[in-house]
Amino acid sequence: MKATKLLATALLVGSALAAPASAKEGMFTPAQLPEIADQLEEAGLELDPSDLTDLTGFPMGAVVSLGGCSASFVSAEGLVVTNDHCARGSVQYNSTAENNYLENGFLAATKGDELAAAPGSRIYVTTELTDVTERVREGTLEMSPVDRYAAIEQRRKDITAECESEPGFRCLVASFYGGAEYTLIKRLEVRDVRLVYAPADSIGKYGGDIDNWQWPRHTGDFAFYRAYVAPDGSAADFSEDNVPYAPAHHLKVNAAGLDDGDFVMVAGYPGSTSRYTLLAEVKNTFDWTYPTFQGLLTDWIATIEETAPEGSDARVKYESRLAGLNNFEKNLRGQIDGARRVGLVDRRAAREVGLAEWIAADEARADYAPAIEALAELSIESATAARTNFWYNNATRPALLSAAQRLYRLSKEREL
């Protein structure tokens, strides 16, 4: 089956350089979709792209975040579908060597049979979005870089704190296009999350990492959670008195499946896109960052597999982390191979040459050239600092050390 692909993100929490959307494939914010409406229609989209810009309406309002994974409501009673590996931590939490849901799978025949998800599991339902760009950036252009950074960070924290004064909600001030835009995202934080279904590894991990990140796939890569809230609809901790959350919107699964050439669009919360990075950043990514990280992940995976043999109780406890590491390593390896195959660095270099020629062709654009040169220099400085941070961040990855570090940081933040 060969389907036309286009990835549309419900929210991009990260940074990128601003540029018009032009490619048929790739990752876009919903606000960009009307800009490529003709291309979407040609590819097979039957909906009005403008309808996809409302993240609290249908259908985008059915898409939720698990804090690190995307998911969707698929019933009026809070049933949520996500990827198998996204629920793996909860399956692992409820498994033992004697009662191994990872190996055998799990199905709750009734709501009463559903299992509490792993501690800390959350479902975030976006309820409101507000443009706060002016409030965050006002007066910062005249500041020094250090003062500008401090001011923006403090304003983002202040706005977040104001938003979270309402119980049951978590808020985030997301940066877009390298700080050109800021959006306040208000989300209901569902804290009572229960496991409904997870496939056995023979289904959910069929093909192992050979099939992962590739198409076509033959894996049953899905699992179900259910969101629960207090009887009054507010967010609440786990309680037998809680009731299934009634989402404003949910998606219906098309049992007919796909036909060859069908249009496919995926909406989710992937974190960030690097579509608009400069040549210097692309080179650093594929010459150092990705290869170094891939090597580190490979060593980490080998260490876990050696010290926690297959079938041991230790392996059960490490399964979720091992799956995540393999998932990430395969992704990095694929990106490195793909970039080399398509000549990404050379293509990006040619694009920047074309941009330089376009600037040079008109005196009115002359101010752009020094700005781009300054950006390239800053990219090199940033890459140097990032390498130091890379090793620091990974040196503190062990679970106990990471937890201790986070607790210490949070205790200090409470003092401020």
Model-derived features: positions:
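Terminal presequence/propeptide segments associated with secretion/organelle targeting
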Residues: 2-4, 11-14, 18-416
